[in-house]
UniProtKB/Swiss-Prot annotation:
This is tRNA (guanine-N(7)-)-methyltransferase. Catalyzes the formation of N(7)-methylguanine at position 46 (m7G46) in tRNA. Signal peptide: none annotated. The gene is trmB. PROSITE patterns: SAM_MT_TRMB. It comes from Deinococcus geothermalis (strain DSM 11300 / CIP 105573 / AG-3a).
């Protein structure tokens, strides 16, 4: 089953995601490619574990969904998302039996190491979400990345590396077959938590069932009689940096469209928060008392994050710069 970001709860649970098999082990695979690994690996268990697969390629998502469906693996959830925000916001503490990472992108160029998945912050996050006895399983053909991952695991202070042979299923992936045909070797490690740190979930929420719910970021304002939407130009704002989150958020207001259904406009905004990116619509609609409501729209299934709240604020601030009088801020 393919899930959108908005289909998850924050955090979620195996009981909700896998209502027919909640008691089974729960395994997450990062970068499942065309889905060859999981049918082979699941077959090594008496009963197929519950599976959560995360991938950033839409084409791979569709291929893997078909492969798992044909294999009869119904207790599998696939999603197109970066791994870190999914693990941090969706997965409860101490709930995973394993996190599988087969042939991750090694980002081999100088200066690109910061893009690698298996760095110390990821290992701390993984340790917080793994059950006692769980592990991160890495299989790779890239020797330097393998050594890098082992160093980062040690630097995390919460993981130790056990060097072992890869599970046979890891050698059935597309890349593993390619490297074996070329006579190249692969390396494998089990990164086992020595400590389970507390890594909190962020302030993330699902879009409420009703757009009128107070939890939907919004503002109420009065536009000037001379408001000119043609004055809009692409606009970028940044903020939200803290000691815990030095990156914060970036909001780019891309386009302002006239609404065909009601008196008002719709703003398209691009919101970036670390590895998580969303494109959201923010409505500017007329109210019966002559004021306008600025509000996040449900279209596209956004989740409500600090950056999305900030996007509503950035739109409100821009309208204020155009002469609007803000009566209420609900973000």
């Amino acid at each position: 089953m393919i899930f959108r970001l908005a289909d998850f709860h924050f955090p979620d649970s195996a009981a909700r995601l896998y209502p027919d098999t909640p008691q089974r082990p729960w395994i997450l695979e990062v970068g499942f490619g065309d889905g060859r690994f999981w049918p082979h690996y699941a077959a090594t268990f008496p009963e197929a574990p519950n599976y959560l697969g995360v991938e950033i390629s839409g084409v791979s998502l569709l291929k893997a969904e078909r492969r798992l469906r044909e294999a009869g693996l119904s207790n599998a959830v696939l999603t197109k998302l970066p791994a870190t925000p999914l693990i941090r916001e969706v997965v409860p503490a101490g709930s995973l039996d394993a996190i599988v990472v087969n042939f991750p992108d090694p980002w081999p160029k100088a200066g690109h190491a910061e893009h690698r998945l298996l760095r110390a912050p990821f290992f701390r996050l993984a340790a917080s979400r793994l059950k006692p006895g769980g592990a991160v399983l890495l299989t790779t053909d890239h020797d330097e990345y393998f050594e890098f991952a082992c160093r980062e695991a040690e630097a995390s202070g919460v993981m130790r590396a056990e060097l072992t042979d890869p599970p046979p299923a890891a050698l059935e992936t597309k890349y593993a077959r390619k490297w074996r045909e070329l006579g190249l070797e692969v390396q494998h490690a089990r990164f086992v938590p020595t400590h389970h740190p507390h890594v909190p979930h962020g302030t993330v929420a699902r879009f409420p069932d009703s757009e009128d719910a107070p939890a939907v970021p919004h503002a109420i304002l009065t536009l000037p009689a001379a408001f000119d939407p043609g004055a809009f130009h692409k606009h970028t704002a940044r903020g939200g940096q803290t000691r815990e989150d030095p990156v914060g958020w970036t909001v780019v207001l891309l386009e302002l469209y006239r609404s065909l259904k009601q008196d008002g406009w719709v703003m398209l905004a691009h919101v970036v928060e670390g590895e998580l990116t969303q494109e959201v619509l923010i409505g500017i609609s007329a109210r019966g008392d002559g004021s306008h409501l600025v509000r996040l729209a449900s279209f596209g299934g956004p989740i409500i994050t600090p950056g999305v709240k900030a996007a509503v604020g950035v739109v409100t601030d821009w309208l204020e710069e155009q002469g609007a009088a803000v009566r209420h801020r609900g973000y």
